[in-house]
């Protein structure tokens, strides 16, 4: 069982690091509060666009396709990291590691083919499922109630 002095002696550097980092954060926040501008007025919270009066809303509406691209990038980027780690240790992993990496790549390719098949990577405008034909109902052929 460790005594308190042994624990303190073992973890003193981490405690000093925590105290210094918390103190530095508090010092920066206090400095910003003291030195920061104190403008209070009608136009304080309005967005500033290089001296031009802002028109409309400041929010941009982005297509969901951009979020899909970002999500695909993150997914395939993380998998590239796994493959890089495997490629640096290929000699130590042997044939078992090669087979595991091949299965991993096949799963990635299956996922990519699935995304292409469902049209997740298609940037063209959506096509209609059916053609809309104009109706040929005339007023003369209509039944009277």
Curated annotation (Swiss-Prot):
Bilayer topology term: Multi-pass membrane protein
Swiss-Prot/TrEMBL keywords: Cell inner membrane, Cell membrane, Membrane, NAD, Quinone, Translocase, Transmembrane, Transmembrane helix, Transport, Ubiquinone
Cellular location(s): Cell inner membrane
Top-level EC class as recorded in UniProt: translocase
Source species, domain of life: Bacteria
EC number(s) given by UniProt: 7.1.1.-
Transmembrane segments: 14-34, 66-86, 96-116
Catalytic activity, reaction form: a quinone + NADH + 5 H(+)(in) = a quinol + NAD(+) + 4 H(+)(out)
A GO cellular-component term linked to this record: plasma membrane
GO MF, one annotated term: NADH:ubiquinone reductase (non-electrogenic) activity
HAMAP family named among the record's database cross-references: NDH1_NuoA
PANTHER family: NADH-QUINONE OXIDOREDUCTASE SUBUNIT A (PTHR11058:SF21), NADH-UBIQUINONE OXIDOREDUCTASE CHAIN 3 (PTHR11058)
Protein family per UniProt: Belongs to the complex I subunit 3 family.
Role: NDH-1 shuttles electrons from NADH, via FMN and iron-sulfur (Fe-S) centers, to quinones in the respiratory chain. The immediate electron acceptor for the enzyme in this species is believed to be ubiquinone. Couples the redox reaction to proton translocation (for every two electrons transferred, four hydrogen ions are translocated across the cytoplasmic membrane), and thus conserves the redox energy in a proton gradient.
Oligomer status and interactors: NDH-1 is composed of 13 different subunits. Subunits NuoA, H, J, K, L, M, N constitute the membrane sector of the complex.
Protein name: NADH-quinone oxidoreductase subunit A
Gene that encodes it: nuoA
